[in-house]
Amino acid sequence: MGVKKPWIQLQKRLNWWVREQDWNQHVDQLHMLQQKSIWESPLLRAAKENDMCTLKRLQHDQNCDFRQRGALGETALHVAALYDNLDAAIMLMETAPYLVTESTLCEPFVGQTALHIAIMNQNVNLVRALLARGASASARATGSAFHRSSHNLIYYGEHPLSFAACVGSEEIVRLLIEHGADIRAQDSLGNTVLHILVLQPNKTFACQMYNLLLSHDGGDHLKSLELVPNNQGLTPFKLAGVEGNTVMFQHLMQKRKHIQWSLGPLTSSIYDLTEIDSWGEDLSFLELVVSSKKKEARQILEQTPVKELVSLKWKKYGQPYFCLLGMLYIFYMICFTTCCVYRPLKFRDANRTHVRDNTVLEQKPLQEAYVTYQDKVRLVGELVTVIGAVVILLIEIPDIFRVGASRYFGHTVLGGPFHVIIITYASLVLLIMVMRLTSMNGEVVPISMALVLGWCSVMYFSRGFQMLGPFTIMIQKMIFGDLLRFCWLMAMVILGFASAFYIIFQTEDPESLGEFSDYPTAMFSTFELFLTIIDGPANYSVDLPFMYHLTYFAFAIIATLLMLNLFIAMMGDTHWRVAQERDELWRAQVVATTVMLERKMPRFLWPRSGICGCEYGLGDRWFLRVEHHQEQNPYRVLRYVEAFKSSDKEEVQEQLSEKQPSGTETGTLARGSVVLQTPPLSRTTSLSSNSHRGWEILRRNTLGHLNLGQDLGEGDGEEIYHF
């Protein structure tokens, strides 16, 4: 019985995995069965084909059951709505009014009503007819097809109102609200219609629909619809940050923006920092953004006023405190290292019993370890080390439960492996203390490990510097990405060739060929060969087996030439990918560090940033003032663009005239000059690099996307353009 139960659990897990793999096939089968059931049923077929004659005949047929359903549990009204057959749907509602409130019974469309389908198809007339005949504007479609998952291509929520908002039909939205649809309704994930709009791929109409729904948010509610959180505690604003929806984020920020004054190209604005400022919030917006799995979320850090707020906090409080913390940790590690170097040792009392035993010192027992003045000085350092380890654990452990172990240890921007390293180090220090108090031998093992891990943690403080911060992420990605994959390949190669070398030399004299005398030694020698630490560990003064030469030749080609160079290429690719986004990663590191320090530091050492609205009659909210500089005359830039067009056109014409000086080609040149009057945006390679680069700068500036660091590259040297 004890053996059978685990086998049943394993079988259930395998069946679940197979069902997940065959999800698409399962859905395909359901839709095929649906078409089959529609074809076999005269009522469903007539609803699909809008066959009014058949429906009238079935209407007078007493044996016809209008409650019959298809393979998915759908009624004839569902089928008519699915195929946009308004006449058939109206006849069915007149014949069987109860069909209006009927929903689909089978997965994956459980709970779907004809109203949901009509809204999806944006059939306004059918929606109006359904609502007029009593269709519920609050019906919920709870099937798996309406969940937010990788299996589904769309996520429209569960309520008809969210369906209408997601398809972008303002008329249907107004109809539903007039018929009692609750705009504050939440689905099984706790998402309101505003949350669902944030998740839509079409950002433009989502913003328009967002405003429309907010205009209907009235009543005596204590909290605005925008501040209603979902099951994860995310408001629509925070969800936009987590998803990296910069369009929706900017749209919401414009609603919080108040222009104070405008003077020529300068504009002074104040931004409401509600939900943005992480000061005093358990679920920080900034922390949610930097810990998001989506790369687009990091673009939020470049938006106003987030960029200005982070810069203010980092320069005023974050950077000084972080540098001070880094120096304290270095002094702490120096103290720990000194205590380890001068640990209590004495000369060994017992005689050596083996010729290979080279130990001359041993650890002192607890009674002899703290006797002299030097021992008492070391005791002070050891107490500092132990207290520091306890403080580290008290700081780290609450964050593990607050954030979650997987995100806390797995996200490189939040610190990732450094948290594992520092917690392991602190645990080893406490283990050393226990071993010292109990006079247990072998403390050299945790001491050596703690020294390595403790000094490696110093790299964590490099994130305070723009030049060094991204390199720590680069090292992490190489270790946990490239190196792990390479180690799997290396293990297979070493295992295979070590076995081959051992078999080849198994019949030889081990005194002459000690490198492959036994299997463990053969494994280690092959590992050294793989890393080119040693060269061909064989005794060439004796006859070697013929297979050794062939095997060693194959090993040298595969290991040294192929795999090591492959590993170098993999690390080079990782370096290139991280280098492309190094500035973005460093900003994310700065935000994560700022939020961490703000959460840990006492409030009197880290006051709240911004302007309190209470002092100026703006309520209990905080604001940040930002000054913008805008080009006062955009037509001046357009003139620069036209100047570059004409100069580039003349340059191309000169080059073509040099290549085609003969009179027979004049017509071709003339025709070419006509084409050159409207040069394409992608300039020809014959143009000079300075002119081409200048054109790109002006074109991007005109379109409002000027970003020299990202679009035109960095590190190419400073170039000055004279207009």
UniProtKB/Swiss-Prot annotation:
Subcellular location: Cell membrane; Apical cell membrane
A Pfam family of this chain: Ion_trans
GO cellular component terms listed in the entry, alphabetical order: apical plasma membrane; calcium channel complex; plasma membrane
GO terms, biological process: calcium ion homeostasis; calcium ion import across plasma membrane; calcium ion transmembrane transport; calcium ion transport; calcium ion transport into cytosol; protein homotetramerization; regulation of urine volume
PTM per Swiss-Prot/TrEMBL: Glycosylated.
Distribution of this protein across tissues and organs: Detected in kidney (at protein level). Detected in kidney.
Record carries keyword GTP-binding: no
Ranges that cross the membrane: 321-341, 379-401, 413-435, 442-462, 486-506, 550-570
Start and end residues of each stretch annotated as Involved in Ca(2+)-dependent inactivation: 643-646, 693-723
Residue(s) carrying Phosphoserine: S682
Protein name: Transient receptor potential cation channel subfamily V member 5
Gene of this entry: Trpv5
